[in-house]
Curated annotation (Swiss-Prot):
A motif (KFERQ-like motif 4) lies at residues 990-994. A motif (KFERQ-like motif 1) lies at residues 355-359. A lipid is attached at C130, C836, C837, C843, C957 (S-palmitoyl cysteine). This is NACHT, LRR and PYD domains-containing protein 3. It comes from Macaca mulatta. A motif (KFERQ-like motif 2) lies at residues 603-607. A motif (KFERQ-like motif 3) lies at residues 797-801. LRR repeats lie at residues 741-761, 770-791, 798-818, 827-848, 855-875, 884-905, 912-932, 941-962, 969-990.
Length: 1035
């Protein structure tokens, strides 16, 4: 009965609700706060329910007591105080067995109804504020989705755009933080830096702000660095869209604000509140509520490198108040330095040229480098760009055949330009084969297709417009200016009508949020036109300013540009100079003159060649990365005669290669270098995990990273790679058979591998190959290439020096190698086999070489587990009178005193042996005693003996002292890292004073000697100045 009574009572209350209030009541039933311990009712069941059905549903879902409490709470929520008070007074008496609703605000009997009503209103007010905040979040997300869901298609008609999600192609991101030295240049690799020992780590967008491990703090600042056109802005926009779409950072950020740095720099003063307001859809956003939780805000600052003159070390007081108006640079600096909303997170995009400046402002940032498109993603981009699948397939196949162009397409901007050109040529039936080999060629074709005059007066007007564009670009480059006002355009002879035409032709883009400001479609286009500034012949020669303008134009003297090139090696001039080389190609010059009806000067060619000659003689380009950067300039030119003349100035080439583009460029230049005498090539490579996956899927991996210099990729030298391709090796190594002067080749520290080695060996067997010294340490070789090397040894009589250290050749590989070493035509004199995974099993083969080879004089087999047995085998053959071995290296070979008798017998019989290296073997005092027997033999001619770290004590010093007074040949004795003690050293001091001791160099451990020993050593050096005592650090 009670159940029916409660349901009837509740139904009567609901019956008093008018239709509007009843709808509100049902809405609150659906959104009833779960923390109040009641189950909300599904909309499908309440939508058509009348007051009786609704009361029944409430009781069925929650029981009588909770249903009544829900009704009372909702009466207050819909502002029906009359029903609220009446229901409170009419509340049934619940039995003790019923579970009470633990909500003192709603059903607490101790408080008066008035107090309860006021408390409930306050609670509902808070709920309403939260709801409004959530409502605004939803509104803001909707606005961000609409703003960022489309991107302008630079090929499209005015007003047309494409879907960002449909066009976006995933970019490769790696978690990197490199030093200034590594970021000096995208081609820089000093010495033998082993970047392959530190593989790069890929990172996904959703993990950008996650800690590195469970013990680390969350990341609050992320820096996206990458070259021009690599996709920084498109990636930033994609992050905005994904967040607004609910697929990214939902649990971390309530608001993401996109800040275009160059736009902020144009505004005189504004507050952070103003900046946030400019990002919002309406003029009155709840800014105070937004900034009240800064940890829930992410500021996405795009284009830090585009700030004009900002972030000086002495910028002045920083801003800490979000309501205070400041200059744009101060505002951004305050955010970046965490003075303004320090709990907020930042995501900053920049070109590497500004990275050092930015780094000083940041505290523990996460650096993420954008590597562009992988091969698979390049293919994906083509298929997204071309709506017709057949066209996409044909275009991609064509590009794949052109390795250079295909490599360049890892840069999204270049990929877009190539696709645009291909589409235009497909539509006109032309071929892209010869117009897309270099960056200059691609840009030349693309821009000339847009700037074709229609004849008559339009030709003259086009030339004037082109000159204006070039002078504007050059003036901007020299002043590091990328945004131009209408007054700038007028100063360079460009009118509004001209700009509108260029807008349609996409040479300029009008800034959406910055009226009356213009910029080149991309920095590289500005650099291209700046290069043309030095080549276009004006109608009025010698003009230095525009008529009607007081503007002073940059000097057109190319020598001024080239002189400043070195000073701006991390700046904008590098690519201008590259374009300059590319544009003076004679065929390209004729093409441009025909297409643009403008005259282009050829005088600059001689100046460029003279500049190279001067720099070469001054040795300015012998230091990396300038030498490789020069190769890029020459490659852009694509004229073999010019390149050959330029390369004649560089007999010695030392470069480190990171990208396939590096390979192609260097191969082109080296092939045209006929006077090179020494060639040293290093290869840097790392493979992110995602690239390894692509390799497993059978995709051909490219070494892709920025080929743009300075502002384009000054820091990007640690790049991804698999093994060097055979095609590249053939191209590069072909120079070995054509250059008569090239005698040295250093390929140490690269991933040449067996396939590459096979190609190299084919070249080394060529009769015109003059290589005498070949270094192949750490090249990833195995026993599989040893047969090919053996063929070289048995046929190439010019090769006299070979280093194969740090390659896992193994015993079987040495067996194959020894076949060539024993050949009558083999003239090899020096052989390094250090750390080649050898054991005593290979010693029989090596021993046979020692007894048969007439040329081998130096053999280094240290860092291999040869052991006493292996060395005993070598010694047996080394005693042969026909053995010409002069230097033998057995460092860290696992030797003990057991092999010393065999070594001693070699010393007493082989008068050719002058150097013996035994460091790192536990010979002990007993071993030295045995060794000294051979050393004291009259026929022993040993000059250098290294016994560092051989477990020696003072007990061996008597034998060694005897040796020092008796030996007529020994000049250097190294005893470092042995505990000889004061007694042993004092014994040496006495012996070394004697005139019969001819030793010139003594190596001892750097250890604490007593006062007497120190005095004796000082006295010895004073009395015998010809003796050098070297104190080596103890290990």
């Amino acid at each position: 009965m009670k159940m029916a009574s409660t349901r009837c009572k509740l139904a009567r209350y609901l019956e008093d609700l008018e239709d509007v209030d009843l709808k509100k009541f049902k809405m609150h039933l659906e959104d009833y706060p779960p923390q109040k311990g009641c189950i909300s009712l599904p909309r499908g069941q309440t939508e058509k329910a009348d007051h009786v059905d609704l009361a029944t549903l409430m009781i069925d879902f929650n029981g009588e007591e909770k249903a009544w409490a829900m009704a009372v709470w909702i009466f207050a929520a819909i502002n029906r105080r009359d029903l609220y008070e009446k229901a409170k007074r009419d509340e049934p008496k619940w039995g003790s067995d019923n579970a009470r609703v633990s909500n003192p605000t709603v059903i607490c009997q101790e408080d008066s109804i008035e107090e309860e009503w006021m408390g409930l209103l306050e609670y509902l007010s808070r709920i309403s504020i939260c709801k409004k905040k959530k409502d605004y979040c939803k509104k803001y997300r909707k606005y961000v989705r609409s703003r960022f869901q489309c991107i302008e298609d630079r090929n499209a008609r005015l007003g047309e755009s494409v879907s960002l999600n449909k066009r976006y192609t995933r970019l490769r991101l790696i978690k990197e933080h490199r030093s200034q030295q590594e970021r000096e240049h995208e081609l820089l690799a000093i010495g033998k830096t082993k970047t392959w020992e530190s593989p790069v780590s890929p990172i996904k967008m959703e993990l950008l702000f996650d800690p590195d491990d469970e013990h680390s703090e969350p990341v609050h600042t992320v820096v996206f660095q990458g070259a021009a056109g690599i996709g920084k802005t498109i990636l930033a926009r994609k992050i905005m869209l994904d967040w607004a779409s609910g697929t990214l950072y939902q649990d971390r950020f309530d608001y993401l604000f996109y800040i275009h740095c160059r736009e902020v720099s144009l505004v005189t003063q504004r507050s952070l509140g103003d900046l946030i307001m400019s990002c919002c859809p309406d003029p009155n956003p709840p800014i105070r509520k937004i900034v009240s939780k800064p940890s829930r805000i992410l500021f996405l600052m795009d284009g830090f490198d585009e700030l004009q003159g900002a972030f000086d070390e002495h910028i002045g007081p920083l801003c800490t108040d979000w309501q205070k108006a400041e200059r744009g640079d101060i505002l951004l600096s305050s955010l970046i330095r965490k003075k303004l909303l320090p709990e907020a997170s930042l995501l900053i995009t920049t070109r590497p040229v500004a990275l050092e400046k930015l780094q000083h402002l940041l505290d523990h940032p996460r650096h993420v480098e954008i590597l562009g498109f992988s091969e698979a993603k390049r293919k994906e981009y083509f298929f997204k760009y071309f709506s017709d699948e057949a066209q996409a397939r044909a275009a991609f196949s064509l590009i794949q055949e052109n390795e250079v162009l295909f490599t360049m397409c890892f840069i999204p901007l270049v990929c877009w330009i190539v696709c645009t050109g291909l589409k235009q040529q497909m539509e006109s039936g032309k071929s892209l084969a010869q117009t897309s080999k270099t960056t200059t060629a691609v840009y030349t074709f693309f821009l000339s297709s847009l700037l074709q005059p229609r004849g008559g007066s339009q030709e003259h007007r086009l030339c004037a417009h082109l000159w204006g564009l070039c002078s504007l670009a050059a003036d901007g480059i020299w002043n590091q200016k990328i945004l131009f006002e209408e007054s700038d355009l007028r100063n360079h002879g460009l009118q509004k009508a001209d700009v509108s035409a260029f807008l349609r032709m996409n040479l300029f883009q009008k800034e959406v949020d910055c009226e009356k400001f213009y910029s080149f479609i991309h920095m590289t286009f500005q650099e291209f036109f700046a290069a043309m500034y030095y080549l276009l012949e004006e109608e009025k020669e010698g003009r230095t300013n525009v008529p009607g303008s007081c503007l002073k134009l940059p000097s057109r003297d190319v020598t001024v540009l080239l002189e400043n090139y070195g000073k701006f090696e991390k700046g904008y001039l590098i690519f201008v100079v590259r374009f300059l080389f590319g544009l003076v190609n004679q065929e390209r010059t004729c093409y441009l003159e025909k297409k643009l009806s403008c005259k282009i000067s050829q005088q600059i060619r001689l100046e460029l060649l003279k500049w190279i000659e001067v720099k070469a003689k001054a040795k300015k380009l012998q230091i990396q990365p300038s030498q490789l950067e020069l190769f890029y300039c020459l490659y852009e030119m694509q004229e073999e005669d010019f390149v050959q003349r330029a390369m004649d100035y560089f007999p010695k080439i030392e470069i480190n290669l990171s990208t396939r583009m590096d390979h192609v460029v260097s191969s082109f230049c080296i092939e045209n270098c006929h006077r090179v005498e020494s060639l040293s090539l290093g290869f840097l490579h790392n493979m992110p995990k995602e690239e390894e996956e692509e390799e497993k899927e059978g995709r051909h991996l490219d070494m892709v990273q920025c080929v743009l210099p300075g502002s384009h990729a000054a820091c990007s030298h640690r790049l991804v790679n698999s093994h060097l391709t055979s095609s590249f090796c053939r191209g590069l190594f072909s120079v070995l058979s054509t250059s008569q002067s090239l005698t040295e080749l250093d390929l140490s520290d690269n991933s040449l591998g067996d396939p590459g080695m096979r190609v190299l060996c084919e070249t080394l067997q060529h009769p015109d190959c003059n290589i005498r010294r070949l270094w192949l340490g750490r090249c990833g070789l195995s026993h599989e290439c040893c047969f090919d090397i053996s063929l070289v040894l048995s046929s190439n009589q010019k090769l006299v020096e070979l280093d194969l250290s740090d390659n896992a050749l193994g015993d079987f590989g040495i067996r194959l190698l020894c076949v060539g070493l024993k050949h009558l035509l083999c003239n090899l004199k020096k052989l390094w086999l250090v750390s080649c995974c050898l054991t005593s099993a290979c010693c029989q083969d090596l021993a046979s070489v020692l007894s048969t080879s007439r040329s081998l004089t130096r053999l280094y087999v240290g860092e291999n587990a040869l052991g006493d047995a292996g060395v005993a085998i070598l010694c047996e053959k080394a005693k042969n009178p026909q053995c010409n071995l002069q230097k033998l290296g057995l460092v860290n070979s696992g030797l003990t005193s057991a092999c010393c008798s065999a070594l001693s017998s070699v010393l007493s019989t082989n008068q050719n042996l002058t150097h013996l290296y035994l460091r790192g073997n536990t010979l002990g005092d007993k071993g030295i005693k045995l060794l000294c027997e051979g050393l004291l033999h009259p026929d022993c001619k040993l000059q250098v003996l290294e016994l560092d770290n051989c477990n020696l004590t003072s007990h061996c010093c008597w034998d060694l002292s005897t040796l020092l007074t008796s030996s007529q040949s020994l000049r250097k004795l190294s005893l470092g890292n042995n505990d000889l003690g004061d007694l042993g050293v004092m014994m040496f001091c006495e012996v070394l004073k004697q005139q019969s001791c001819l030793l010139q160099n003594l190596g001892l451990s750097e250890m604490y000697f007593n006062y007497e020993t120190k005095s004796a050593l000082e006295t010895l050096q004073e009395e015998k100045p010809e003796l050098t005592i070297v104190f080596e650090p103890s290990w």
